[in-house]
């Protein structure tokens, strides 16, 4: 559980970001000039850990980094970071040979800062977010596969901006807006670097279930956030016939769950490529799927 002060600053940042006319909503995230600059970058952290442990074999490296909740792995294109580095419940004095790893992890997770050029309010808000959600740090600079124009973190912020700008988002109750905000921040939290990752909705939902334990919220709220994350790829599964409209309707019939997923799907599509062509390619399918599934949901709710 994180402190009340960190929690309050986290939610205050999100509340400020969603306000009409906020610096966040007025920022052109699609610009090539927009970037999230870390004082201690993800890439530097990976290189420092690799250099520090270069004389250890793979099993020894895994054992050492595992103490801190992460692993350094060689992917198809990149040396990548898996997991979420942390020094929680660890004392540097007790770690002997791992003490230097402790200091690198502490610098990356607890002492790090984000800078966004010419965006002082958004810089402050993002630093409040990473204090409560340091897992987000692992996404900054994490390259996606070739279809995407943005790293995972910038993509996530663009999705959040698209969600908060959506007309239907403004009509949602406060709790639904909060759930959708948290779902967006973690919807790609486990996405693999530099490759297509079909498992990430399920894996991200699973990890989010653990990450959300740091917040004092009811189990039903956590479950709803994880439901949104697990099904944020509903459009692809609908379009490819992987999941039937009836199955979607049964799973997503409660409250505003499907409406929130439609808002998320549109923002997600628009946040893939700078030129917007990915959204143009699938917007008709999105509309068709939304109509079909909504009709079945209406029938189920009416018959209940």
Where are these regions (language model features)?
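Non-catalytic interface/linker regions that flank or bridge core catalytic/transmembrane domains
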Residues: 2-132
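Exposed alpha-helical structural elements
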Residues: 9, 48, 100, 104, ...
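Generic hydrophobic secondary-structure packing signal
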Residues: 9, 152-155, 200, 204
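A generic secondary-structure signal
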Residues: 13-16, 162-166, 211-214
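Acidic/His-rich, divalent-metal-binding segments that scaffold phosphate/diphosphate chemistry
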Residues: 87-195
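Divalent metal-dependent catalytic cores for phosphoryl transfer on phosphate-bearing substrates
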Residues: 168-274
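Metal-dependent nucleotide-binding catalytic modules
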Residues: 251-260, 264-304
């Amino acid at each position: 559980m994180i402190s009340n002060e960190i929690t309050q600053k986290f939610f205050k940042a999100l509340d400020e970001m969603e306000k009409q006319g906020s610096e966040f909503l007025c920022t052109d995230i699609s610009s090539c000039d927009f970037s999230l600059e870390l004082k201690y970058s993800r890439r530097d952290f990976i290189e420092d850990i690799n250099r520090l442990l270069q004389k250890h074999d793979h099993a020894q490296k895994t054992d050492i980094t595992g103490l801190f909740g992460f692993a350094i792995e060689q992917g198809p294109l990149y040396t990548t970071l898996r997991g979420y580095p942390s020094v929680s419940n660890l004392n540097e004095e007790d770690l002997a040979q791992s003490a230097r790893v402790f200091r690198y992890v502490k610098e990356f997770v607890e002492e790090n800062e984000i800078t966004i050029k010419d965006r002082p309010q958004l810089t402050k808000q993002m630093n409040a977010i990473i204090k409560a959600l340091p897992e987000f740090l692992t996404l900054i600079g994490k390259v996606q596969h070739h279809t995407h124009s943005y790293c995972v973190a910038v993509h996530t912020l663009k999705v959040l901006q698209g969600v908060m700008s959506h007309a239907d988002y403004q009509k949602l109750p406060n709790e639904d807006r909060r759930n959708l905000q948290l779902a967006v921040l973690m919807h790609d939290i486990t996405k693999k670097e530099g490759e297509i990752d079909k498992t990430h909705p399920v894996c991200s939902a699973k990890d989010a279930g653990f990450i959300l334990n740091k917040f004092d919220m009811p189990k039903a709220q956590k479950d709803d956030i994880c439901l949104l994350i697990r099904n944020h790829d509903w459009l692809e599964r609908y379009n490819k016939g992987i999941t039937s409209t009836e199955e979607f309707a049964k799973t997503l019939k409660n409250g505003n769950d499907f409406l929130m997923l439609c808002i998320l799907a549109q923002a997600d599509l628009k946040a893939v490529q700078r030129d917007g062509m990915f959204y143009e390619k699938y917007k008709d399918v999105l509309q068709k799927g939304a109509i079909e599934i909504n009709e079945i949901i209406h029938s189920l709710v009416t018959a209940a």
